[in-house]
Design a protein with these regions (language model features):
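Rossmann-like NAD(P)H-binding beta-loop-alpha module
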Residues: 105-117, 122, 138
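C-terminal substrate-binding/catalytic lobe of Rossmann-fold NAD(P)-dependent oxidoreductases
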Residues: 2, 10-39, 121-236
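Rossmann-fold NAD(P)-binding glycine/threonine-rich loop
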Residues: 61, 74-95, 104-106, 112
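Short glycine-/small-residue-rich Rossmann-like dinucleotide-binding loops
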Residues: 51-52, 75, 180
């Protein structure tokens, strides 16, 4: 594949390294100060986008106009999904809050657990995530995805609270908490607590390597497909 990397921070550099090791060609690199245009994508097969919430929608539009497939790892733009889905017709777009293959297996495990816990009102679910102190957003996009899985499958949880509570939390509220410290690539815990016992499900990333390999696997899967997809559609 001839790949354009849109965003060349820590994740972009990790993808660049993994792609070259796998024999893929990095033909374009767009750093933060370089505008992505359809013309600049003429000689690429696919884009892998890890930029910023402010830039991602315009970057997607450039890829769509150029009829180039795009894998998007940036979060914080999903409110624009309806209008993006309306214009992605002649190319493919795959987005995810986390491209780690292990995390996407974890998503499916959590969904199965949530379905079971929907029948067990004694258990109260919660989410806690830990990332390095330089991470800008809180909670993480992955934690938001996990919260969505729980609230969609546990009827007694109607809303999510992702900040310190002001007083008691309503029983129908799912609490999501965050820690920013040290150099953690990412640890996510989904817990279910009752008066009798506790169950913790945890995924711990050891490096960004898993995210990079997952993004490249997603790019290969996307080639030749049209429309909008998520990692739920990818055969793991």
């Amino acid at each position: 594949m001839k790949i354009a990397l849109i965003g060349f921070g820590k994740m972009g550099r990790e993808i660049d390294s993994a792609a070259r090791e796998q024999g893929e060609m990095i033909t374009r690199v767009f750093e933060w100060d370089r505008t992505v245009t359809p013309e600049a994508l003429a000689d690429v097969d696919i884009c892998i986008e890890f930029s910023t919430p402010d830039a991602v929608v315009q970057n997607i539009r450039a890829a769509v106009e150029a009829r180039r497939d795009i894998v998007v790892g940036t979060t914080g733009w999903y409110q624009y999904l309806p209008e993006i889905k309306a214009v992605v017709k002649e190319s493919g777009l795959l987005y995810s809050s986390n491209f780690s293959l292990g995390m996407n297996i974890f998503f499916r495990i959590v969904k199965q657990a949530a379905v079971l816990m929907n029948r067990s009102a004694d258990y109260d679910p919660y989410i806690h995530e830990i990332h390095h102190r330089q991470k800008a957003d809180s909670p993480s996009g992955t934690a938001v995805s996990l919260a969505r899985i729980l609230t969609e499958n546990i009827d007694r949880k109607k809303e999510t609270l992702a900040k310190p509570p002001d007083g008691k939390i309503n029983p129908d509220t799912l609490h999501v908490t965050s820690t920013r410290a040290g150099f953690f690539p990412g640890t996510h815990t989904v817990g279910f607590d009752s008066e009798s016992d506790s169950i913790d499900l945890r995924h711990t990333a050891k490096s960004r390597r898993g995210f990079a390999l997952g993004a490249l696997a997603a790019a290969r899967w996307l080639r030749g497909r049209k429309g909008v997809y998520t990692m739920d559609d990818v055969d793991l």
